[in-house]
Amino acid sequence: MTEYKKVIAHNKKALFQYFIEERLEAGIVLKGSEVRSLRQGKASIEESHAADTGHEVFLYNCHIAEYEKANRFNHATRRPRKLLLHTKEIKKIIGRIRIKGYTLVALSMYFNKKNKVKVELGIAKGKKLHDKRESIKEKDWKRDQSRLIRQK
């Protein structure tokens, strides 16, 4: 089942720095100037993460550039943004990220089929240095394999 997604931003570092154990989709509360800026593709979620504040989940460090035509109605570029999730999902997430070593990272931000902005989140556990080295070796080996196959 392929679903339409127009990707705005992708967090490649998260896949290298974390083991992603579970993925989920969340809506996000945005202002009008933020949506216009996202339509131009001016967003970065490289350092972003999500955290709970009681019964809500917020996305921190997500950079959405200012929309130049918004004048005085512009938004703060790195403000915390509320994520829209069902209560069951929030309780499940809070239970998982309260365990030592787990965090909630933003993997990608995209427009869905109905033109709503969605954020793909991952419940993740941090990699150690030797795990990162291992993933680099695997990536290099796959690249070498594909080169060998193309040469034949």
Curated annotation (Swiss-Prot):
Organism annotation: Rickettsia peacockii (strain Rustic)
InterPro entries linked to this entry: SmpB, SsrA-bd_prot
GO CC, alphabetical: cytosol
Family assignment from sequence similarity: Belongs to the SmpB family.
Any GO MF annotation of the entry: RNA binding
Source domain of life: Bacteria
Name recorded for this polypeptide: SsrA-binding protein
Job of this protein: Required for rescue of stalled ribosomes mediated by trans-translation. Binds to transfer-messenger RNA (tmRNA), required for stable association of tmRNA with ribosomes. tmRNA and SmpB together mimic tRNA shape, replacing the anticodon stem-loop with SmpB. tmRNA is encoded by the ssrA gene; the 2 termini fold to resemble tRNA(Ala) and it encodes a 'tag peptide', a short internal open reading frame. During trans-translation Ala-aminoacylated tmRNA acts like a tRNA, entering the A-site of stalled ribosomes, displacing the stalled mRNA.
Gene3D superfamilies: 2.40.280.10
GO BP terms: trans-translation
Keywords, ordered alphabetically: Cytoplasm, RNA-binding
Pfam family, one: SmpB
Localization annotation: Cytoplasm
